[in-house]
């Protein structure tokens, strides 16, 4: 499932100078959790260079064998620490050990007590319940064939249905060994994966779920057979990268699936080229996302904190142990970067080195082939790979990006709109006035997206009421959305039951200050917004009142004084910009919009 484990390598120090020795790159490992991949030989890229002897990470390179990634792709910066730095890989390795139920590495000292070694359930002397309540008659319904893939918990086989609605149809059967389920976490992962596959199966870019069975030794998950191989194999077959036009077609499919399961309150947590399969070997084959073994529910009012995923694709906030659906967007940004240039945006010789690059280094957009790639494509990738998760586009916003617009990707409801509107109606009148001024300075490209979202909510008489938000969410609801409790946000939007949002106020409620700050024209946007605020919404405000607006204490008074003009007691430009950015939304118990 996740692959953030590491090898014990004592001979290479991350901060040492690189010697000039050479060695063979490791072969690309086919550890597909679902289907087989093409085994045809990969053509040699014309842009080959000396073989990199330090590609010793177990995470497989997206480059063809013999192609060394340029050190300039991720600058080889020297991170100087007064003491040896803590390894960012340790939390991931520890989390995966807990899920798999495996013991930690041997250490000096006494043998740990049972409670210490047992992880999260399933310790010594504790009997795990591995009965899932699934049907038992797998062999009566399916004829099992050859193995087509293998992963940590089990393997995937070709099979043929002997009876039922899909009689005679070939399917893929993921066989998960119960002997590998040695912790309560690993058992819960399997249960949740099956639940998610059932709930999300209807989308055109989600692998279809057919059935699930079990016996005393295994769980059998019956799914659609995708015979076109992994996206990673397709990248390799093209010499390491996709032409821009083809990359767009791939990314639209990835984002379409992601926008769908994000709307259901699901975060995948392991998006990478190996977890996307083509339905056939045809050029126009549909791409489908697989492997929800590490996925979880992302409730609107909570952040996840367990560190899982694959090293090259893990988001900075995952390493900081506070993340949600935005972490998947980062992973798609890494995939986008690889598709367009054939190199990883972050590279290291060990997992710890990779994670330090993820946290500190910036992707390189100057070396070849980036000068030949369109500026709008680079803007797209940069807006996915923003280290501040609040400034990243959502999957629905990415589908509306100008670079993808000619692909006619269609639009899905963006749940971030609900969170922003909820915050708006719970904000103070002064905060709402500031946002209304900002909405009048929104660039045309951003207005296109907001207009589309407004229409998806099906306004009546030019405005939106609470029931418009309720109906729209119900239209897209699956069992996964119910499990993630996303509809609970509607209880916090009750003030809309007695008020209508027209499009102008909807824009004020739905605009993300952080995402606007990520735009190159942010200073111009803020200047125009401040002019509107000066003429329409500004008023005199005391330091104490401003501190209360921003949930700050008396210690902040000296700082806030610089934000208020002494002449008339109103916010100056700096104060307005900081006020928009700061912690301004009151708690859910604050007074609703009047």
Swiss-Prot record:
SMART domains assigned: S_TKc
UniProt: Ca(2+) 2 binding residues: 500, 505
Subcellular location: Membrane
Residue positions binding ATP: 148-156, 174
Modified residues (Phosphoserine): 310, 352
Chain spans, region Disordered: 1-126
Natural source organism: Arabidopsis thaliana (Mouse-ear cress)
Enzyme Commission designation: 2.7.11.1
InterPro entries: CDPK_Ser/Thr_kinases (IPR050205), EF-hand-dom_pair (IPR011992), Kinase-like_dom_sf (IPR011009), Prot_kinase_dom (IPR000719), Protein_kinase_ATP_BS (IPR017441), Ser/Thr_kinase_AS (IPR008271)
Region feature Calmodulin binding (CaMBD), mapped onto this chain: 427-447
PTM note: Autophosphorylated.
Signal sequence extent: none
Membrane topology classification: Lipid-anchor
Protein's job: May play a role in signal transduction pathways that involve calcium as a second messenger.
Domain Protein kinase: from-to ranges: 142-404
Keyword annotations of the record: ATP-binding, Calcium, Kinase, Lipoprotein, Membrane, Metal-binding, Myristate, Nucleotide-binding, Phosphoprotein, Repeat, Serine/threonine-protein kinase, Transferase
Chain intervals for the UniProt region annotation (Autoinhibitory domain): 408-438
GO molecular function terms attached to this record: ATP binding; metal ion binding; protein serine kinase activity; protein serine/threonine kinase activity
Record entry for activity regulation: Activated by calcium and calmodulin. Autophosphorylation may play an important role in the regulation of the kinase activity.
Family statement: Belongs to the protein kinase superfamily. Ser/Thr protein kinase family. CDPK subfamily.
Name of a matching Pfam family: Pkinase
One GO cellular component term noted in the UniProt record for this chain: membrane
Protein name: CDPK-related kinase 6
């Amino acid at each position: 499932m996740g692959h953030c484990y590491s090898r014990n390598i004592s001979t290479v120090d991350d901060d040492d100078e690189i010697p000039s020795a050479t060695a063979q790159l490791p072969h690309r490992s086919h550890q597909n959790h679902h289907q087989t991949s093409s085994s045809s030989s990969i053509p040699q890229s014309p842009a080959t260079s000396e073989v990199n002897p330090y590609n010793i990470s177990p995470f497989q390179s997206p480059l063809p064998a013999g192609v060394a990634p340029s050190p300039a792709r991720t600058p080889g910066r020297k991170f100087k620490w007064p003491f040896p730095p803590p390894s960012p890989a340790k939390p991931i390795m520890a989390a995966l050990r807990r899920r798999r139920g495996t013991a930690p590495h041997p250490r000096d000292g006494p043998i740990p007590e049972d409670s210490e070694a047992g992880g999260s359930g399933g310790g010594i002397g504790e009997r795990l319940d591995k009965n899932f309540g699934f049907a038992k008659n797998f062999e009566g319904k399916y004829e099992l064939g050859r193995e087509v893939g293998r992963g940590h918990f089990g393997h995937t086989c070709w099979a043929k249905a002997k009876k039922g609605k899909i009689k005679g149809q070939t399917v893929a059967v993921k066989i998960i060994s119960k002997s590998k389920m040695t912790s309560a976490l690993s058992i819960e992962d399997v249960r949740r994966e099956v639940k998610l596959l059932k709930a999300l199966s209807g989308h055109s870019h989600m692998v279809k779920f057919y059935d699930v069975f079990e016996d005393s030794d295994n769980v059998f998950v019956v799914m659609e057979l995708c015979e076109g191989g992994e996206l990673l194999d397709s990248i390799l077959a093209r010499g390491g990268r996709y032409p821009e036009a083809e990359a767009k077609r791939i990314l639209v499919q990835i984002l379409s699936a992601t926008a769908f399961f994000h709307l259901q309150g699901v975060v995948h947590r392991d998006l990478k080229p190996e977890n996307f399969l083509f339905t056939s070997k045809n050029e126009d084959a549909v791409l489908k996302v697989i492997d929800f073994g590490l996925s979880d529910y992302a409730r609107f009012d909570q952040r996840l904190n367990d560190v899982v995923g694959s090293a090259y694709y893990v988001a900075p906030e995952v390493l900081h142990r506070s993340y949600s659906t935005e972490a998947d967007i980062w992973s798609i940004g890494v995939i986008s970067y690889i598709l367009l240039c054939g190199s990883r945006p972050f590279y290291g010789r060990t997992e710890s080195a990779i994670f330090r690059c993820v946290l500190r280094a910036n992707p390189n957009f100057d070396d070849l082939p980036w000068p030949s790639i369109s500026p709008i494509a680079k803007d797209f990738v940069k807006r996915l790979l923003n280290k501040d998760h609040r400034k990243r586009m959502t999957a629905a916003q990415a589908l509306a990006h100008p670079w993808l617009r000619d692909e006619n990707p269609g639009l899905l409801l963006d749940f971030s709109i609900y969170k922003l509107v909820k915050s708006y109606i719970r904000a103070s009148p002064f905060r709402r006035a500031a946002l209304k001024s900002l909405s009048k300075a929104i660039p045309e490209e951003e207005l296109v997206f907001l207009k589309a979202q407004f229409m998806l909510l099906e306004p009546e008489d030019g405005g939106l009421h609470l029931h418009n938000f309720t109906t729209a969410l119900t239209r897209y609801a699956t069992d996964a959305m119910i499990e993630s409790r996303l509809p609970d946000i509607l209880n916090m939007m009750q003030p809309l039951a007695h008020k209508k949002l027209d499009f102008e106020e909807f824009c004020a409620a739905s605009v993300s200050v952080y995402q606007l700050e990520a735009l190159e024209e942010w200073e111009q946007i803020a200047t125009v917004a401040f002019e509107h605020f000066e003429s329409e919404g500004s008023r005199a405000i005391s330091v104490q009142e401003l501190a209360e607006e921003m949930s700050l204490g008396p210690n902040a008074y000296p700082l806030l004084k610089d934000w208020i003009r002494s002449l008339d007691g109103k916010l100056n430009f700096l104060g307005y910009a900081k006020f928009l950015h700061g912690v301004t939304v009151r708690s859910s118990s604050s007074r609703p919009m009047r």
